[in-house]
């Protein structure tokens, strides 16, 4: 994608209200409480030499001899790449899963640059001739390759070579829903990172839009769409990938999309799938945010009806829904309703290492969630060391801290205990103000 376009969009969508990042003296190795764990997308291996537990441990273990460990890792990665062309489907799937783990947890740009053509050919065969899980894993690895290689000629070449296959699998109604789901995510992320031509962006938007638009009802926004349960995940992934690309879309395209999609998108709020309802709600909030960026006094004709639906979802107490789903839905739609009505997005803070990332817009939330989905537990490592992510989120150059600096930044245990105790007390007070005082009522 064009660097100027991405930079302008992110300043507009992510930092206009003071969002950004700054160094922090408080280390927090855990992830944000509200971050959802990525879905497991792996298969059991039939190739113990490639997918043993020791192989996985070597990808994320403590660094003892960094150079020696890097050499061992590269040797294993060479084996994985060689196994991508094995005759056994299970061996290929095992190699793809091992590559996925490695690319999510480490930065390997030099290794990948040397083998990008080999990897592109292997992934092309997996997407063309593979079935189901193999296609899904190949698409996931492609998305990670785009994150590793970043924007520029090499990343763009890789994306262009495999984009037609992603579109083909995604558009094939006979393909596995899991494969189509991962192709939708890879298409959105790859286009966001590597596409430099506006026509690539427009074509990817159209392809993703066609996936969820075909399930709109025929009777207007009040008609519930009929979506097979097996396709709920696919529609959620396509909608989220489409929303990701909206964050870099030119204003002229945004205007057409608002006219075409905003009146119809609320239909998905009545879906039986909580994930699809949440994806639709967050996308609606993003569309309102983009619309108000274009026109400060933006007015939506069916505002009252939309807010009524959002309010119902924000207070849903149906017992037939799982408690965790109800809690997640209410939390999300309270934020969506607040944003649609008042135009403000609740700020979220993500701490990693000695740094802090502030997210104060729906555009920034969507971008973070897209990378989090593919990187999983490796998200913090990439935020600290991946120049692409640091550029996108405005984190500046990679911090180089020696042992002395690390020791100086480390907070004493007693001070950390006092800070956590004060934060816990403040959080308890804040929550108690909005809880139902049933004892007082009785």
Swiss-Prot record:
Region Disordered: start-end pairs: 1-71
Tissue specificity, please?
Expressed in many tissues including heart, brain, placenta, lung, liver, skeletal muscle, kidney and pancreas.
Show the ranges annotated as biased composition (Polar residues): 43-56
Query: Which InterPro entries does the record cross-reference, listed alphabetically?
Result: ARM-like (IPR011989), ARM-type_fold (IPR016024), IFRD (IPR039777), Interferon-rel_develop_reg_C (IPR006921), Interferon-rel_develop_reg_N (IPR007701)
State the superkingdom.
Eukaryota
Q: Which GO annotations describe the biological process of this protein?
A: adipose tissue development; fat cell differentiation; negative regulation of translation; Wnt signaling pathway
Q: List the Gene3D superfamilies.
A: Leucine-rich Repeat Variant (1.25.10.10)
Q: What residue spans carry the Basic residues bias annotation? A: 1-15
Q: Name one GO cellular component term.
A: nucleus
> Which terms are listed as keywords in the entry?
Translation regulation
Example GO molecular function:
ribosome binding
Q: Does the keyword Calcium apply?
A: no
Question: What functional role does this protein have?
Answer: Ribosome-binding protein that acts as an inhibitor of mRNA translation by promoting ribosome inactivation. Associates with the P- and E-sites of the ribosome and inserts a C-terminal helix into the mRNA exit channel to preclude translation.
Family of the protein in this entry: Belongs to the IFRD family.
Question: Entry's PANTHER family?
Answer: INTERFERON-RELATED DEVELOPMENTAL REGULATOR (PTHR12354), INTERFERON-RELATED DEVELOPMENTAL REGULATOR 2 (PTHR12354:SF8)
Quaternary structure and partners: Associates with ribosomes; promoting ribosome inactivation.
Q: What is this protein called?
A: Interferon-related developmental regulator 2
Question: Which organism encodes this protein?
Answer: Homo sapiens (Human)
Instruction: List the top taxonomic levels of the source.
Output: Eukaryota, Metazoa, Chordata, Craniata, Vertebrata
Name of the gene encoding the protein in the UniProt record: IFRD2
């Amino acid at each position: 994608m064009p660097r100027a376009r991405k930079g302008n969009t992110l300043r507009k969508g992510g930092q206009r209200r003071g969002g950004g990042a700054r160094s922090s003296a408080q280390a927090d190795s855990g992830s944000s409480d509200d971050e959802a764990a990525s879905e497991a997308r792996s298969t059991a291996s039939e190739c113990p030499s490639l997918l043993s537990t020791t192989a996985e441990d070597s990808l994320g273990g403590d660094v003892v001899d960094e150079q020696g460990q890097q050499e061992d890792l590269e040797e294993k990665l060479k084996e994985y790449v060689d196994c991508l062309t094995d005759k056994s489907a299970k061996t290929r799937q095992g190699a793809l899963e091992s590559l996925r783990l490695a690319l999510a947890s480490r930065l390997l740009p030099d290794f990948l640059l040397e083998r990008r053509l080999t990897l592109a050919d292997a992934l092309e065969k997996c997407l063309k001739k593979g079935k189901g899980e193999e296609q899904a894993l190949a698409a996931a690895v492609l998305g990670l390759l785009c994150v590793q290689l970043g924007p520029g000629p090499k990343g763009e070449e890789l994306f262009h070579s495999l984009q037609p296959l992603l579109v083909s699998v995604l558009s094939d109604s006979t393909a596995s829903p899991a494969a189509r789901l991962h192709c939708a995510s890879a298409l959105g992320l790859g286009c966001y990172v590597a596409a430099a031509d506006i026509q690539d962006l427009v074509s990817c938007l159209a392809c993703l839009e066609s996936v969820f638009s075909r399930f709109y009802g025929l009777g207007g926004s009040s008609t519930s769409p009929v979506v097979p349960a097996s396709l709920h995940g696919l529609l959620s992934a396509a909608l989220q990938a489409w929303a990701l690309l909206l964050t870099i879309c030119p204003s002229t395209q945004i205007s057409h999309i608002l006219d075409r999609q905003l009146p119809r998108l609320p239909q998905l709020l009545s879906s039986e799938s909580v994930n699809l309802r949440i994806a639709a709600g967050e996308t609606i909030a993003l569309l309102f945010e983009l619309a108000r960026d274009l026109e400060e006094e933006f007015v939506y004709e069916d505002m009252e009806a939309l807010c009524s639906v959002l309010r119902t979802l924000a207070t849903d107490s149906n017992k037939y829904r799982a408690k965790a789903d109800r809690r997640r839905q209410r939390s999300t739609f309270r934020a969506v309703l607040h944003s649609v009505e008042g135009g403000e997005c609740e700020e979220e803070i993500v701490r990693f290492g000695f740094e802090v990332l502030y997210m104060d817009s729906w555009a920034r939330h969507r971008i973070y969630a897209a990378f989090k989905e593919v990187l999983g537990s490796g998200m913090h490592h990439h935020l600290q060391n991946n120049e692409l992510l640091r550029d996108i989120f405005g984190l500046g150059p990679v911090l180089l801290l020696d042992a002395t600096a690390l020791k100086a930044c480390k907070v004493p245990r007693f001070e950390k205990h006092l800070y956590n105790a004060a934060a816990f007390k403040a959080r308890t007070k804040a929550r108690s103000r909005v809880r139902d005082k049933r004892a007082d009522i009785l």
